[in-house]
UniProtKB/Swiss-Prot annotation:
SUPFAM superfamilies in UniProt: S-adenosyl-L-methionine-dependent methyltransferases (SSF53335)
Domain of life: Eukaryota
EC number: 2.1.1.319
Residue ranges constituting the SAM-dependent MTase PRMT-type domain according to the UniProt record: 141-450
Protein name, per record: Histone-arginine methyltransferase CARMER
Function text: Methylates (mono- and asymmetric dimethylation) the guanidino nitrogens of arginyl residues in proteins. May methylate histone H3 at 'Arg-17' and activate transcription via chromatin remodeling.
Organism of derivation: Drosophila sechellia
Length: 530
């Protein structure tokens, strides 16, 4: 699609007017401050006229003031939000309260004043209606979009070879779903998935990104000469308007334990733009849950909390905080990886259907548990990982974060019990995991476990927003007690076997190089020097 048809251009213009305007600039603006409110006396705040630069931000619109004579230096920066007080004054002036400043902006033309007024009104009009804003604290949203606005964080995700390559294979391997199709990329970030869609033959991709990463995505689009294919739209999917319905929605909405960050709700919300029988990549997600035994991990957290059990720390008694310290450490989910042999039973699978589940279904997720214990030991908590499937017309592709699969930047998550429970092979462990969404873009995770036929039970509530990142990069160790033969004898047997092979190779006229026989024949060089 080399250019937009008139009707499409009209719709895009409408979308721009509905969504918060971005990248607007107004030249020749005289900025005055109100010196005396009763007498309505004004004084010029800056010498000469200024240029106002407006750019979309997750919290509203950033307004930067620069001099008309020197635009390289920002004189002042303000934030226009839903709470900003503003009013029109005549045909070319606009009064606005920004931070502690009561300003009057006199524009160079009536058209500029009307456009600036629309910028302010759009912010005030849209934010109260936003589903995202209703479910998210402003401080959490600000930190979230700031985090994903860093190139280093985008690089961290892009360099996850398993993640990025699986997405590319799923999209290119199902090119029939993308060829000449309209695609929506939700939470586009750098736009890498949008580029994959274009590689698969997409006619048009709308890349929606709410963080400042949108400007970098636009740079990549322009430098790769695909601006006729990819339209980067700054904003949240809950707030923007598209000019048309789409055939496919692509996104990478998964967080730790699948649901963290509550991006899945945004992904499901985007279905309002999906045509009937449209595709979603990925199509569904499976959360796996299994009981595990890991005395080392439990002791590590327990001993950290025991710092607060000191009665003479530099002469200060800390013991009054021991209980709260213990509670805080055990409220932290552990993000790392492990040998799957620590799992004491087959995992329970909870499915999230991205094509049919509703946003509200993710506000309170109750997962019943029933485990048939395969090995006797102490259950220290529950382990979580997830798989997602891309169900395409040509092939199905899976992305897995299982401990048996190659490691990804999601790792796995473990939730500890403050009071572990001893359980025997053949017993049944039942219970429930309850994920309760909060306005910090995460979940409170409550675990309740009970050994059937006994009075033994244990529970805990954890804060998924505050995990402990334990992964060190060291190789995963097998759980204790899994060796069925002497490891020492196994090693020396291998050494003896390798030595016998090397000796045999030498006797047969060859030279062993790094354990590989017949590496080279040096006899010719020794007997026939040049």
């Amino acid at each position: 699609m080399s250019s937009l048809r008139p009707e499409e251009a009209r719709k895009l213009a409408t979308a721009a007017s509905v969504s918060p305007l971005s990248n607007c600039q107004f030249c020749g603006v005289v900025i005055s401050s109100i010196a005396d409110e009763q007498k309505l006396e004004f004084t010029n705040k800056y010498k000469g006229s200024c240029t106002l630069l407006c750019s979309y931000d997750s919290q509203g619109v950033v307004l930067r003031v620069v001099s008309d004579d020197d635009r390289s230096h920002v004189l002042k920066e303000y934030m226009i939000t839903a709470d900003t007080d503003a009013a029109q004054m005549g045909r070319r002036s606009y009064a606005v309260s920004l931070d502690a400043d009561n300003l009057v902006l006199r524009f160079g033309s009536e058209q500029d004043q009307q456009l600036f007024r629309k910028v302010v009104e759009n912010v005030k009009h849209l934010r109260p209606k936003s589903v995202f804003s209703q479910r998210t604290e402003e401080s959490s949203a600000s930190q979230y979009f700031q985090f994903y606005g860093y190139l280093s964080q985008q690089q961290n995700m892009m360099q996850d070879y398993v993640r990025t390559s699986t997405y590319q294979r799923a999209i290119l391997g199902n090119a029939v779903d993308f060829q000449d199709k309209i695609v929506l990329d939700v939470g586009a970030g750098s736009g890498i998935l949008s580029f994959f869609a274009v590689q698969a033959g997409a006619a048009k991709v709308y890349a929606i990104e709410a963080s400042n990463m949108a400007q970098y995505a636009q740079q990549l689009v322009e430098s790769n000469n695909v601006q006729h294919k990819i339209s980067v739209i700054p904003g949240k999917i809950e707030e923007i308007e598209l000019p048309e319905k789409v055939d496919v929605i692509i996104s990478e909405p998964m967080g730790y334990m699948l649901y963290n960050e509550r991006m899945l709700e945004t992904y499901l919300h985007a279905r309002k733009w999906l045509k009937p029988q449209g595709k979603m990549y990925p199509t569904h997600g499976d959360l796996h849950i299994a009981p595990f035994s890991d005395e080392s991990l439990y002791s590590e957290q327990y001993n950290k909390a025991n710092f607060w059990y000191q009665s003479a720390f530099h002469g200060v008694d800390l013991t009054t905080l021991h209980k709260e310290g213990m509670k805080e450490y055990f409220r932290q989910p552990i993000v790392d990886t492990f040998d799957i042999r620590i799992c004491m039973a087959k995992s329970v699978r909870h499915v999230c259907d991205f094509l049919n589940d509703k946003e509200d279904d993710l506000h309170l997720i109750s997962i019943p548990l029933e485990f048939h214990i395969l090995q006797t030991g102490i259950c220290h908590g529950l382990a979580f990982w997830f798989d997602v499937e891309f169900s395409g017309s040509s092939q199905n592709v899976w992305l897995s974060t299982s401990p048996t699969a190659p490691l990804t930047h999601w790792y796995q998550v473990r939730c500890l019990l403050p009071m572990p429970i001893f359980i025997k092979q053949g017993q049944t462990l039942t219970g429930r995991v309850l994920l309760e969404a909060n306005r910090r873009q995460s979940y409170d995770v409550t675990i309740d476990l009970h050994i059937e036929g006994t009075l033994i039970s244990s529970s805990n509530t954890l804060d998924l927003k505050n995990p402990y990142f334990r992964y060190t990069g060291a190789p995963v160790q097998a759980p204790p007690g899994t060796s069925t033969q002497s490891p020492s004898e196994q090693y020396w047997t291998q050494v003896d076997t390798q030595g016998s092979r090397n000796s045999s190779s030498m006797l047969n006229g060859g030279l062993s190089v790094n354990g590989i026989g017949d590496g080279m024949d040096i006899t010719h060089g020794l007997m026939h020097p040049h």
